[in-house]
C-alpha cells in the first residue's frame, strides 16, 4: 500500500433542526396551548484511531465529510431526532491541526481513541418553550444553530521505537529486512526507498520493538533537498536513532566520515530535540571491507568522526553483527518503557495511610 503521510480535509457537522410553531387542536377546546417541539441537534464528526490503518491515502480521494442535520421539531410536543454522526477512521499517530492557522487540535496516540473534530449545532426552540403566564399562545420559534465547519490538515507520524538515519544507499532497507518482518524494496542504487517502512523486530515471546526506515537524507535536506526531510517527522517519537553508515561506498572518492557529519548537521538544523535523542552508530557493509583492514578502518572512522557513543559493526547483507545489535536495542527500548511506566513517587508524608473513601 502506498504510504501517504499528509492530507487535507473539510469537515462539516450537521446544523440543528428548526423549532416548530404549533397549537393543540382538540374538540371543545378552542384555545389549545402551544405544542411545538424543539429541533434535533446536528450530527457530530468524530475521528477514531484505528490500529489497522497505516496510511492517510483514503483522505486524498475523499476530501469533504458532512454529518446529517437534525430533524425539525413538530407539533404534539414532538422533538426532532438528532442528525446521524459520522466517524472518520485514522491511523494511530495522526496529528490533526487547523489547515488555516496551523494550530494543533488533536493527536491520536492510542488505539481506539476518539475525539470530536466538529460539533453539531443545537436544535432550535419550538413555541412550547416560550409559553408563560403572560404569553399563553406564543408564536415564537428559533432556527437551529449551524454545525461547526473546519478545514483540517492530517499529518501522520509513525509510532516506532527505533528510527534509521543515513545517506541513500547506506543499507537501511537491507538492515530492516534482515531483522524484521518488513520487506522493503532493495536495490543497489540511491533513493530506492521512497516512503517510510515499518518493521516489527521479534526478540522473543512478547518481546518486540518497531523500527522505522525513512528515505535517505542528503546534504540540504533540512531546507527541502531530497526526500528524507518530508519524513524526518516520523523520527520525532522514536526512543532511539540508529545512524547507519556505508563503510564501503562504490565511489572511492566518497568519504564516509564527511557523509556522516552531513547527516548529523542536517538533523541539528531540522530539530534540536531530534538531534539530542539517543543515537547509536551502525557501521554497515563491513563484509565488503577486507578482514585485515576492518579494525583500522573502524578505528579511523570513529576517531575522525569524534564519536563517543555506542558503535556497532555489522553487515546487513550477511547478518553478521545484527543479533547483538538487536539485543542491545531491545534492552534500551525496554528500559525506557519501564522508566516511562514507572509509578509516581509517593510523598513520604502520606506513605502507609489507608485510602480515604
Swiss-Prot record:
This is GTPase Obg. Mg(2+) binds at residues 173, 193. The keyword Acyltransferase does not apply. It comes from Acidovorax sp. (strain JS42). Keywords: Cytoplasm, GTP-binding, Hydrolase, Magnesium, Metal-binding, Nucleotide-binding. Monomer. One of its GO terms (biological process) is ribosome biogenesis. Residues 1-159 form the Obg domain. Its EC number is 3.6.5.-. Pfam families: GTP1_OBG (PF01018), MMR_HSR1 (PF01926). It comes from the Bacteria. Its cofactor is Mg(2+). Belongs to the TRAFAC class OBG-HflX-like GTPase superfamily. OBG GTPase family. GO terms for molecular function: GTP binding; GTPase activity; magnesium ion binding. GO terms for cellular component: cytoplasm. GTP binds at residues 166-173, 191-195, 213-216, 284-287, 315-317.
